[in-house]
Amino acid sequence: EAVGNMGFQTGNILEPSMGVGNFFGLLPEQMQGSKLYGVELDSITGRIAKQLYPKADITIAGFETTDRKDFYDLAVGNVPFGQYQVDDRAYNKLGFSIHDYFFAKTLDQVRPGGVIAFVTSRYTMDKQSPEVRRYIAQRAELLGAIRLPNNAFRANAGTDVVSDILFLQKRDRPIEIEPDWVHLGQNEDGFAINRYFVDHPEMILGRQTSESTQYGKQDFTVVPIEGLKLADQLHDAVKYIRGTYQV
């Protein structure tokens, strides 16, 4: 919906780490004429995706084996999370963990003016080190971000984690820039969270609070607001995602 509001209708769409292609299945009608490209490491899941989307160009291999520079108009998906690195010669020097690597590689594969809409762990935005956010900001403009409550993926992943949807538009070339969202601020409870969400609390779709970790510490979390449907909240939030799709 957010990408449609920007003016995107059809083009080359990439879903890296696609699983069985949940995002492909949710494409709005006006985008159905797009050419779909997917990448999935797991052979069984990848074969299921090929059966579900026979017209899509699906690669059953690691994302590191693909290399379509400046090719895609739109990239969507759920970024894999982990503390390990992917062995990709072109990116090894960055030292990024897998979810950060997916952002870096996708930024190279999307064309200038193209859009990335990724679901990622809140630590992309909230981790102490600004290094990865600075890398992204130099190569793409943050059009907006939506922070989801911790139960948003309970049915899918069986875990209560806070996730973000990030909307990025690739720049024509990397520039030296350090916008506010590269850095952290503090919320009213004193937790360090991304400056974007400090400045735009309306983009947090739940109540900010804390929870006890397995180590007995208090950690930031977002709990759903009783009586509100997440689908309705998302519909309202995407209106704040500012961007114009460039053909």
What are the functions of these language-model segments?
Residues 66-76:
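A short acidic, Gly/Pro-enriched loop at the edge of an enzyme's catalytic core
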Residues 60-66:
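Conserved SAM/SAH-binding loop
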Residues 89-94:
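Short glycine-enriched, charge-decorated loop/helix-capping segments at active-site entrances
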Residues 76-81, 119:
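Amphipathic alpha-helical repeat scaffolds
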Residues 39-43, 95-154, 161-167:
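Conserved Class I SAM-dependent methyltransferase catalytic core
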Residues 1-52, 56:
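Class I S-adenosyl-L-methionine
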Residues 155-246:
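Flexible, glycine-/basic-rich loop-and-beta segments that form/coincide
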Residues 10, 71-72, 142, 163:
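Local beta-strand N-terminus motif with an aromatic residue
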